[in-house]
Amino acid sequence: MARGECNCGAVQFEIDADLTDVFVCHCSICRRSTGSNGIAVVVVPNDRLRWVQGEDHIVMWSKPNADWQTWFCRVCGSPVPGRNDPARMFVPAGSLTEGGDALRVAHHVWVGSKAVWDEIGDS
């Protein structure tokens, strides 16, 4: 069992799955959305994530003319789990508070779009 929450704690969730793989997206949309080098997510089946509280605090935004959406807490603005796919949830790895001890970066995606200052190391 894994647990997570937004920065202010208004949105909380549980995941009934063993979490191991982190996907780091370096596309320009994810970089702008986070203000960083991209976003690190854990992908879980929809039926494995349960909202504990604050589902009514979640705001979804779709980028016009793009197949991209983001979900965030309306109180603190932190990214929260969301769906860009009918079967899977994309859980921001940094939002996990428990159950993420086995997580390791397994894949970097959209590396060709990474920021010029972003260096991806071997360790």
Regions found by a protein language model. Name each.
Residues M1-S123:
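A short Gly-Trp-Pro
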